[in-house]
Structure formats: structure tokens, C-alpha cells
Amino acid sequence: MRRCPCRGSLSEAEAGALPAEARMGLEALRGGRRRQPGLQRPGPGAGGPTGRPEGGGPRAWIEGFSLHSEAERTDFGPAPCPDGPQAEPCGDEHEECEAAGLGVASEKPSQNKELDGSNLQTHPKLSSPLAEMEMAGSWTDGFRTDLHRPDLQARPKRASLCTQPGFDESWTELDRSELWQTLPERDKPWVDHLRTHQDMSRLQNHPACPSPEPSAGTSCKELSADGSRTPHDTDGFWIESQTDGSLIGPSTQTACRQPANDGFSAQDTDGTLIQPGTDDGPWVDSVLEKSNGDDPLMEPEPRDLVTNLCSHLECSSLCPVPRLIITSESPEPGAQPLGPQARIEGGTGGFSSASSFDESEDDLVAGGGGTSDPEDRSGSKPWKKLKTVLKYSPFVVSFHKHYYPWVQLSGHAGNFQAGEDGRILKRFCQCEQRSLELLMGDPLRPFVPTYYGMVQRDGQAFNQMEDLLADFEGPSIMDCKMGSRTYLEEELVKARERPKPRKDMYEKMVAVDPGAPTPEEHAQGAVTKPRYMQWRETLSSTSTLGFRIEGIKKADGTCNTNFKKTQALEQVTKVLEDFVNGDVGILRKYVARLEDLRDTLENSPFFKTHEVVGSSLLFVHDHTGLAKVWMIDFGKTVALPDHQMLSHRLPWAEGNREDGYLWGLDNLICLLQGLAQS
């Protein structure tokens, strides 16, 4: 039985708990790129000759977009049926489950867009007042709406930012006349045709509330001037109003705010694995500590982002997740305290997000680490000295006589163990097993881990899958959590029926924002997990873009998981640019791979009939130019009731089970395309 990564100690490593090779830096030389055992694996999941060919044309969904009613859209299917039976999610003991395996990269050239656009038009709901929006800037010109109504006319040749209304509302078409630049010496084409969720049914005009700097505590921003306003996110350009009384986007702590109490949920990756280099020094667990005031961890600065957005979005009376928790059940134990500070050295790394529900341990602040300033967004040095935690590697992978240690970046210990022949064992989760088995026969197979079934080890069950990183040399890795929510509807129902206090969740919440808990929650010192997750999602780009960055490990060993309040478009764009170090070739490969994935998702029977919640996209590239993306984390992917299908783009309202996966993917592709063009 291997020791879990979060309960070891430095003294054990020094006393010889590790093999000599692990303690001395695994000095074995690498002999080129690693391959899976035997000949090149056939099949689409192995990256071999039968995989997807590289190359291909860009998507044409932006231009010439025809307008259809919702029923006519081939990728949407019939309307959701909220009353049908739902698949049972994995239990709490398996919430940390995720997937990792090999896929195949395919490449398409990026698509260039000319920017145009001049005026603003809004199509509100019949009973709602006219909502207006004003925007300035060349890189936001040409917003576009993703239309579902046959009575609206498309405006040809307009790159667009798509706003997603509620279910009965009209779609908004946004034009601008002035230039808007946020970074000097560069156009910003990547916001063309980005999408936002918007509930237009209760839109109200509101006086402007200028805000000179983006922050999670405001809901009004100055946006240059055509005299119109629309509900908007505080730090970005996307907002989604919820019918359960919650809103994503701005905080609820300013005078000009949206009337949400619970907001959307959030979630960290658990069990994320990372391989430090094999140069020298002990293996380091890269759980990112909160930096103290003397050495703050800097988030990218949203340079000169000026917007002016005000609105009141009224919410329905659906019962929110309870905030006052009264129960006799004892709270679950929190994460282990963080250890001494260290920095990862070396190249080869592994990174795999785990639990779709449990948050990563880097949320907790323990020991003498202190907390970083959540409002510090100077961005002048986005990859400053990072503080990590020294722990020994949970296991060492041996593949083709190449040894590389796996270190858990965040999350619960014991999720992963080393398999044989470059395979990884992940703690068993029935939902994930069922999903992976179905995906092996679905068109999505090249984009998901290759699955080898369940195995038993030391009396414990594991799902066996391929190591996603076996073909990379010193990779850079990024985990993006996809979708507009990361919790199942069943979890909300359970939280209402049997609210369970979580002291560790309360500590995580106050570490980020001491004023976030209610007085009752402060008195009890605990919050429910869905309550924490809903609050957490209001801070991140999950609420504004339909995806959020969970963590990044770069080839030089630098790790960063401090993206809890990375919400604004500019912040997310800067992080993506730093991840690839401005390499246009890598960006184009990522764009081609994601466009191919989007095409496959829209034609996948599995995807149309499953609610995909808490799933991630794993981005991996190395110095050789190899770049791939995979879908991972299927521990909370559940089948829909019979005859129900999802669009994966509509806003979520309790009962419709929409997850917003394609909405987030559309926006992610747009951002990467813009970076490649610039």
C-alpha cells in the first residue's frame, strides 16, 4: 500500500521512506520521447496512425449563421424534461474521482476574423424594458448573438459576442462604434463571438456606476459611452442570471449589485497530479500556499479595463441552498495542513484534476503561510515566486526504463496509484466507470482517456487508464474546469433536505473573503458544500465565460493554482498567454484540437444524452511542439432521463439540467483564436 501524498512528512522522506532514486533526483537519463509499450498503439485513443489526422479547416459557425427556432437546431435536441428520473451520482467517498488517459491530437489552422460593428440593438422580452449596452474598442467590435428565434434577422459578416438569454427571452445583438483597447500595442480580436448568459425577462435600466478597477465586490463598471446599459459581470463580459434566486457575476456586497445570495457553485480540482523534474532535490507537492503580505502571489492585472454596466436582475422564488446549517452530524475533516515552503525544480510533470465536487486543498490556509491579497491584481509579474509544499511523491512511474515521480498537486490523498506499463490507477467511481466504458464506443473516444477497466489492489478498487503524459518531455499542463456549474441538481436537493455543516468549507470561504458567510454561518463556523461551491463560482470565470482555470504547471516547474478570483476576460486571456509563453504554433494546435473536439461533441450520442458536470479539459504541450487536449473527470457525468437531450449552451435553471459545457468551449476557442491571431 503506497502512502498518500498529503499525509507524509519531510522527516519520513529524509529518513529513507523513498527509494534512493527518488531521493537523489532520479538521475536516470531520458532517451527521447516516451512511448507506450510495444508497437504504436492502434486505435484513436493511442495517438497512432489510426488516430485523427492533423490538419483541417476552421469552423464556420461564426459567419453566415442561419437563424432557427430552438426546435430546429440539430445540436439541441428536444426540450429538457426536468421531471424525469436522474442517474444517481457517486457517493461522497468517491467525489474525488477523475480520469486521465491518452488521446489523439488533431490540428486545424486558426481562423482570422475582421472586426466590424457600429451600433447597438437589443431585443428584450415583451414585458421587459429595453436593455442597452455600450462598448468601445476594436477588439470587441462585431458582437454576435447565438439565436434561437426565427423572427430575428441575422446580420451577415459580423463577428460576435453571443449572449445567452433565458428560455423565453429574446437575444441581444450588440454593436459598438468606438475603439476599446486594454493592452497597448495589440488588438484584441479574441472576444469576437464570445457568449454570455443573460436573463432578459427582468432587465431594468439603471444609472451608471463607474468602477475604475475590476473587483469581485462590485457589479457596476464603466464601459465607454453610447448611453446604454445591460446586466453584466463585474470583472468580465458575461453574466448568467439564475431562476433559483442566484446570480453569477458580481459580489453581493456593494450598493450597486445583483440580488443574489447563493450564486453559483465552485469547485477546485482534487487529486491533481504533477511530475516534478528529475534533476535534483526532493519531490515537491505543489499545493500552492497563500502567500503572505511580504511576498504576495500576483494575479494578472486587468490593464485599464474600463466598463460601465448596471442592472437589477430579479430572481425567482425557487428555494436556494440553505445558508443556516443546523444538524447534529459532525463535519467532515478538513484538508491536511500545509507544510514547509519549497519550489518545484525540473521538467517532467503530471497534472490531473480529480474530484468533481471536493475542492483542492490549496484553498485552505494553514501553518504559517498566511493569505495572499485576493484583490492584488497588478499583473506586472504574473509568475512571481510561488510558494509550494514539500512532500514526497506518492509513487514513481516506470515506463520504458524511464522513471518519473508523480506528485499530487491538490486534492485528497490516495486518489491515484502507479499502474504498470505507463498506466495510472485512479480510485474507483462507478459514475466514471460507466462513462468511460460508454465513451470507448463513442466518437469522443480520441478525446478521452483510454480505459482498461477496474482492478483491485490491496483490497481497494481502482479504474485503470493510460498516463496522459507518457508522450511528453517536460510538459506544461493546464486544467480548465468546463461548464456553467460544477454541482449536480441532486446535490442541491440533498443539501436542502439534510444540510450538513462543513467547517473546512467555512474556513476556505473566509480565507478568500471574510465577509462572505452570513452571520448565522459565522456563528456556526460551517457552511454546506453546495453553498460554498455556489459562492465560489460567483468569483471565477465559470460565471462569466463558462469555464475556469483550475491550475497550471509550467515546464520550468512553476505552479499556480491561485485563480479563484480570475474572472475578467483580460485576466483569463493573460493567464492563457502566459501558459503558452506566446507560442503561436502551440496556440494554433490547441485551437485546432478544440475545434475538432467541438465538432465531435455536437455529434456525440453520449454527449447529447448526458449531463456533464465538473468535467475538465487537460491541456498539455512540451518543447518539441507536441500539444494535445483531453476531456477528463467524469465522476459526476450522469445519464439523462429517456428522450431528454441537452443543448449544453442554454443557461441553467434548476430542473433543466443544462451544464453550459459548449458555451464555455465556444468562449475558450474564441480566446485562443484571438491570441493566435495577435
UniProtKB/Swiss-Prot annotation:
SUPFAM superfamilies: SAICAR synthase-like (SSF56104). Substrate binds at residues 481, 502-508, 529-536, 636. Disulfide bonds: none annotated. Keywords: ATP-binding, Calmodulin-binding, Cytoplasm, Kinase, Nucleotide-binding, Nucleus, Phosphoprotein, Transferase. It comes from the Eukaryota. Belongs to the inositol phosphokinase (IPK) family. This is Inositol-trisphosphate 3-kinase C.
